[in-house]
Regions:
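Periplasmic peptidoglycan-binding/anchoring modules of Gram-negative envelope and division proteins
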Residues: 317-322, 327, 333-369, 393-398, ...
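N-terminal segment of the mature folded domain
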Residues: 19-155
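Periplasmic OmpA-like peptidoglycan-binding domain that tethers envelope proteins to the cell wall
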Residues: 361-362, 371-435
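Pro/Ala/Gly-rich low-complexity, hydrophilic intrinsically disordered segments
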Residues: 293-326
Length: 435
């Protein structure tokens, strides 16, 4: 009996240690249909796992990944990619360890899920890449650009014929993502809600972006929207916000979130965190993980320096930077109504620190240029923008970076209209330039 007891006492911890690891990911189709399976396979292989396999599940837009870790433990990762909202719903039911979302958590969701921690905290909210909601038409369509106002008129049904937009084509056929999609929520909040209109009931709805794009590619009268990884032979229109120039969703413009329909791609890690989920996030945020994000058609957060062509109407200080320095491919933004960095900027500051150290430019080689939105009091916009720049300077200083200068340019050079709060938030930004 004593020997049996000793055996059980020693064997039970080993049995527990060898228990299979099971990770459940639910939410965004944009993330879960292709990107996450590739990232998970890469993370498992980086940890020297063997027999890494992807299996199709019984339902559409679901998959199962299995592997055996180097320590002999079996791993199973279940992915259900039915839309961002379904991920938060699954967490509420206790059916998810990690939430994939192509839009930020809403106020009501954050309140409902308080039992799982502050899901807006940097420890829980992880931006793993960027994307743009692209406006798609058939390749035969001669149209090249639309404003956000025009897009709202089209998708609400106020504009129903292509002739109303200056091109031939007859009736407009609308294609949209479904209600549970984070892509649709981004489109609704950025395009429809500011004009207080709803999606026309005639729109055809799709759970998956690749299927939507495939239909637009064969319908000469079509217009739709989807993420950058599922364009599939369609024509992408440039988008204008207010009086700003129309922009295509080019990688540099999405990386800096200047493109009007740029969006962040999130993973939400609830409390208590799953160790397997936390390890996956760490891998995705690494250079190897971010390289995969870019390979899969999204925009990574790896920082690069780029030249900006000087333009005559630039502020003199800004034009001098364009002539002699390079701008980094990141804009640092803030929590609403605050000079505190948002969750993405908190991560990006560390990337800027790493970039400047690796480039051999930690001391007095960086200039911060801060912008804001218009204020009633003269000079207040410039003051507030400088305060935001100082907040970034202090964050960089904690990482050993000595900034050469902080410039507050106030409400100059807006990248969005200031009529709506979301536009004002986009204009409150800090750029990093390097000599």
């Amino acid at each position: 009996m004593a020997r049996l007891l000793v055996f059980l006492l020693t064997a039970l911890p080993m049995m527990a240690w060898a228990e299979p690891v099971h990770l459940r990911i639910q939410g965004s189709n944009t993330l879960g249909s292709a990107l996450l399976p590739v990232l998970i396979r890469a993370e498992l292989r980086a940890e020297h796992a063997t027999q890494v396999q992807v299996h199709s599940a019984k339902a559409d837009n679901e998959s199962v990944i299995t592997a055996t870790r180097a320590d002999g433990v079996d791993v199973q990762v279940d992915i259900a990619a039915h839309g961002s909202s379904t991920g938060f719903d699954a967490l509420a039911r206790g059916e998810a360890d990690l939430i994939a979302a192509s839009r930020p958590i809403s106020d009501s969701e954050a309140r409902q899920l308080q039992a799982f921690g502050d899901l807006r905290s940097p420890a829980a909210e992880h931006v793993i890449g960027l994307d743009g909601v692209a406006i798609l038409v058939n390749p035969a369509n001669p149209l090249s650009e639309l404003s956000l106002d025009q897009i709202a008129q089209v998708f609400s049904g106020q504009v129903r014929r292509w002739e109303q937009l200056g091109v031939a084509g007859g009736d407009i056929h609308l294609y949209a993502r479904d209600e549970r999609s984070g892509t649709f929520e981004t489109f609704r909040s950025r395009v429809l809600a500011p004009k207080q209109v709803n999606l026309a009931p005639t729109a055809r709805r799709f759970e998956a972006g690749d299927r939507l794009a495939a239909q637009v590619a064969v319908d000469r009268q079509a217009i739709g929207f989807t993420g950058l990884s599922t364009l599939h032979g369609t024509k992408v229109l440039a988008v204008a916000d207010g009086t700003a120039a129309a922009l295509l969703p080019e990688r540099t413009l999405v990386a800096s979130e200047v493109y009007p329909l740029s969006r962040r791609l999130f993973l939400y890690l609830p409390t208590p965190p799953s160790p397997q989920a936390a390890a996956l996030i760490d891998f995705i945020q690494s250079p190897a993980g971010q390289a995969i994000v870019a390979e899969q058609g999204f925009v990574s957060q790896q920082i690069v320096a780029q030249r900006v062509a000087p333009v005559a109407n630039m502020p003199a200080q800004y034009r001098a930077l364009a002539e002699h320095a390079q701008r980094l491919s990141v804009n640092l933004r803030f929590q609403p109504g605050s000079a505190a960095l948002d969750s993405k900027a908190t991560q990006d500051v560390q990337r800027v620190i790493e970039y400047l150290n690796q480039a051999g430019k930690p001391h007095r080689k960086a200039v911060l240029v801060a912008f804001g939105d218009p204020k009633d009091t003269p000079g207040r916009a410039a003051l507030l923008s400088r305060l935001r720049g100082e907040a970034v300077r202090q964050a960089l200083a904690r990482g050993g970076i000595e900034v050469l200068e902080v410039a507050g340019l106030g409400d100059q050079m807006p990248v969005a209209g200031n009529e709506m709060e979301q536009g004002r938030l986009r204009n409150r930004r800090v750029e990093v330039w390097v000599y």
